[in-house]
Amino acid sequence: MITRRTCIAAAASSLALSATHLARGQAAFPNRTIRLVIPYGPGGIASVYAQLLCEGLTESLKQPVVIDYRAGAGGNIGVDSVAKSAPDGYSLVIVTNSILTINPLIYSKMPFDVNKDLEPVAMSIVYSNILVVPRDSPFNSIADIVAAAKANPGTLTHASTAVGSSAQLAGELFARQNGISMLHIPYKSATGARTDLIGGRISLMFTDPSAIPLIKEGRLKALAVSAARRSPSLPEVPTLAEQGLKDFNVETWFAISSPANTPKDIVQKLQAEITKVQSRDDFKAKLLVLGVEVAPDMRAAVVSQRMRDEQKMWAPIVRDLKITID
């Protein structure tokens, strides 16, 4: 005979069992290896930063955080692999402002939607691009470049590592704001571009901080940094704003993203741990050697805001240059 008391007892037992299964299914995050995708090949600033971050997070989270290189299509392949992963916090990706703001403007077919398929977790690092010229160049200031370009239209060249790269667009923005024209020369690598620049075959180039050793050695001459404030690695080099381009503020920045719909509590935990690691003095010091700084505001909301601002800045330039990659 089944009594009311029996039913209540059975129901209580069932609830307890369900709670046990639920607790097991929702084990504290993380309980296994986390994958951090770098959407570029090994080497460079992204690799150094990722290695430092993975070491710090592995220690902090008590679970391995490992690097997974997935290069191709200007970073789109690696980011897409994470965008299509399970939204559980175990697949993360380093995204750059080029991927988030320039790629959607120049690629005719994006495999993912930067606004819908990714969840910003934290801002990571920032660095200024550096306007460099050959050491024997007659240019010693922005005014020198502008005067030469206006006196001899069409003779100046600027290099970048690819059509549609942030370096190309920085050069185009520089030309527009100064009312001059320059011929863009795309290269397959930064090494190739810098070799020709050192040899005097190119007039100038916006490059990343990996060129700082060449500047320190006197093989290249730095005329300006592109951010709104001077670089602590090159404190003697003025900003473009200091030389008359008041609205020129171009930085390269990295952020960490997860697939869209990653649970908020997991995103918040990851953001807190990333912020903790990146706030350490030793972490900052190792990056500063490279000319790179930790983002002053690491909140996820900053990623979304900067995306919107930079898409508005680059859209008219990309449109006018008719840059399209199939």
Spans of model-derived segments:
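Short coil/turn segments
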Residues: 42-43, 97-98, 126, 134-139, ...
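Hinge/capping helix and adjacent helix->loop/strand transition within the periplasmic-binding protein
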Residues: 84-90, 105-192, 240, 253-286
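N-terminal twin-arginine translocation
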Residues: 1-6, 14-28
